[in-house]
Amino acid sequence: MEAEKWRYYLQPYINTSRHEGFYERDYTDQLDRFLSQKYTRAEKWIRTREFNRAQSNLEEIKSLDPNYKEVQSLLEFSQVEPIYVQALDLLEGNKFREVHDLLQPMLKKYPNQEVLRKLEEQAIERGKYRLGIISDPNIEGSEATMSAALQSAVISLIQKNNDPFLELLDRTNFEMLQQEQEAIINGTTNEAAVTKELLAADAYLKIVMTHVNENEGTLNKQTRRGWERYYVTTKSNEGEQVKKAQYKKVTYKEYTKQNEASYDMQLAMVERSTSRILWSISFHHEDKDEIHYVEFSGTGDLFSGNWRYQNKEHPSDHRKNDSRSMNRLVKANKRIQSTSSMRKDAISALAQKAAAHVNQQKLTKE
């Protein structure tokens, strides 16, 4: 850059021991003339709205003398003004969300820029989309119970997204929503229920559980016959002690259980003024858990199999070589996820899907 070249050219002469004052004054005079020329050009380019060229000059001036005249104010203006003009054009075209997104980097850089802040507020106010959350008054039972819980979860997740353009109607207005629900479901609008236009929603988000199926299984128990391995110590022909495996006939209990659940949710957005369905989407969630374990009172390794008589041999007696798998069943988990726990998981998962879908719409009033 020209300013840097000028700085490096003059720097060797600043601190010389001979005629130090002369060179210092000369450097200062030259720098003042240089900065004055740059500043005058920057003012000219701002008047002719050549903001990029003005910024380049002002940044050079600031690097040499941050306190030179009004360099900081002019630099801020040269950066803010083109963004402000562009945002005004977008605002006139009702591109409210684009206005907001365009202003954010500059507002972060200059948080006290009141002109930009007011423009942002105007865009948010004009583009704010008011959304009411409703359910189907005709559903009942577990579907109605889950729908209410799901609505609450969706509201919470949407609010956490902090979208400045999306406003959920306050719970104090839900009585008005309920008065309109039946009319909305039937394809009409109940204008008498709208006491204040400012409280009316632009659209309603209908959240309904259309299908709930929860199957809490029974704990199946079967008494089975098997073999327990134990060891006895004997002496070999050489007189050494040797452990020898023996098997005895035992019984054990085998348990199995399976819980499963499936849920279907419908999410639809209905325009308040016309009752027209703007979009509708369905989500499915299912879950399953099962347990399989063995209870055995012995201390040795367990083998499955079968036998006729416990106290005497029979040709039909047989023993499987499956102690590893049987021991795993002895140590297996005995706790199973309940369907009520599955329901909570389903509400959480479906609410996240619903809230994500709503947030992706980038709802803005046109």
Predicted region positions:
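Internal, charge-rich low-complexity segments
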Residues: 181-187, 210-234, 288-308
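Short coil/turn motifs at beta-sheet boundaries
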Residues: 124-126, 198-200, 254-260
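N-terminal segment of the mature soluble domain
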Residues: 133-135, 141-220, 239, 262-264, ...
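N-terminal leader/linker segments that initiate helical-solenoid repeat arrays
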Residues: 1-4
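Short secondary-structure boundary motifs at beta->alpha junctions and helix caps
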Residues: 228, 237-264, 272-350
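A structural "domain/chain start" motif
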Residues: 8, 16-25, 39-50, 56-60, ...
